[in-house]
Swiss-Prot record:
Homodimer. The lineage of its organism: Eukaryota, Viridiplantae, Streptophyta, Embryophyta, Tracheophyta. Acts as a calcium sensor. CBL proteins interact with CIPK serine-threonine protein kinases. Binding of a CBL protein to the regulatory NAF domain of a CIPK protein lead to the activation of the kinase in a calcium-dependent manner. This is Calcineurin B-like protein 6. Residues 20-75, 76-111, 113-148, 157-192 form the EF-hand domain. PANTHER family: CALCINEURIN B, CALCINEURIN B-LIKE PROTEIN 6. It comes from the Eukaryota. One of its GO terms (molecular function) is calcium ion binding. GO terms for biological process: calcium-mediated signaling. Keywords: Lipoprotein, Membrane, Repeat, Vacuole. It is a lipid-anchor. GO terms for cellular component: cytosol; vacuolar membrane. It comes from Arabidopsis thaliana (Mouse-ear cress). S-acylated by PAT10. The gene is CBL6. Belongs to the calcineurin regulatory subunit family.
C-alpha cells in the first residue's frame, strides 16, 4: 500500500493542476526553513509545495484529503492514515499546513534516520498515547490493517500472532510493550518498519518534473544547512 502512494499522489496532482483555475496562496515559510526540519533538500521541498498547493484548500489539507492523496483511499477510512495525520495535527484542528505536511512525509523518506522511524512507529501503535503499547492496541491495528487489505483471518489466528509478538517483545512480563522493548523488537526484526519507507520520495523532483523551482541552492541534504 505504501509503495503505491506516490503514484496516486502524482496522478491526483496532475488532474488537479489541469482543472483548478484559482491561484493557491503563497507559502509563508521559507523553503530553507522548512527543509531544515526534514530530510528533504530545498529543491525537494519546493516540489512538494507545488504538489501541496494542488491538493489544498486555502493552504491547508484535512484528514480526508491527506488519506486520499497518500493512501489512494476515499470511501474506506484507514486507521494507519488517521494515526499518521493525528500525530502531525498537534493542535487537534483537523487540518495540516504545508510544514506539517512536509514533516509527515519526511519520516517516511528512505533517508530518514532509523531511530526516528522506530520512535514514530511506536507512536502509531500507542493509540492511547500512554507511553506503552497494550495488547488491545496491537489487535486493533492488526484487525483494521487486515480488513483494509482484504485479508480475513480467524480470531484464533490473530490472537496467536499477538501472543507470539508479546512473548518476544514483552521482556518485562508486564503485559505491555514500552519504547525500549519496541526498539529491541524492531532491531531484531527490521521488516516491522517496511511500511515506514516510501522509495519514491528519494526522487520527488523527478516524480514531479513539471514543477518550477525558484530557490537557487546547492542541492545537498537539508540537515547539513546552517
Amino acid at each position: 500500500m505504501m509503495m503505491q502512494c506516490l503514484d496516486g499522489l502524482k496522478h491526483l496532482a496532475l488532474i488537479l493542476l489541469t482543472c483548478c483555475d484559482a491561484d493557491p496562496p503563497k507559502v509563508r515559510q521559507n523553503p530553507k526553513d522548512v527543509a531544515r526540519g526534514t530530510v528533504f533538500t530545498v529543491n525537494e521541498i519546493e516540489a512538494l509545495y507545488e504538489l501541496f498547493k494542488s491538493i489544498s484548500k486555502n493552504g491547508l489539507i484535512d484528514k480526508e484529503q491527506f488519506q486520499l492523496v497518500l493512501f489512494k483511499m476515499n470511501t474506506t477510512r484507514s486507521l494507519f492514515a488517521d494515526r499518521v495525520f493525528d500525530l502531525f495535527d498537534t493542535k487537534n484542528t483537523g487540518i495540516l499546513d504545508f510544514e506539517a505536511f512536509a514533516r509527515s512525509l519526511s519520516v517516511f523518506h528512505p533517508n530518514a534516520k532509523f531511530e526516528d522511524k522506530i520512535e514514530f512507529s511506536f507512536k502509531l501503535y500507542d493509540l492511547n498515547q500512554q507511553g506503552y503499547i497494550k495488547r488491545q492496541e496491537v489487535k486493533q491495528m492488526v484487525v483494521r490493517t487486515l480488513a483494509e487489505s482484504g485479508m480475513n483471518l480467524s480470531d484464533h489466528v490473530i490472537e496467536s500472532i499477538i501472543d507470539k509478538t508479546f512473548e518476544e517483545a514483552d521482556t518485562k512480563l508486564d503485559g505491555k510493550i514500552d519504547k525500549e522493548e519496541w526498539r529491541s523488537l524492531v532491531l531484531r526484526h527490521p521488516s516491522l518498519l517496511q511500511n515506514m519507507s516510501l522509495q519514491h520520495l528519494k526522487d520527488v523532483t523527478k516524480t514531479f518534473p513539471n514543477f518550477v523551482f525558484h530557490t537557487i541552492v546547492t542541492d545537498t541534504p537539508s540537515e547539513l544547512d546552517g
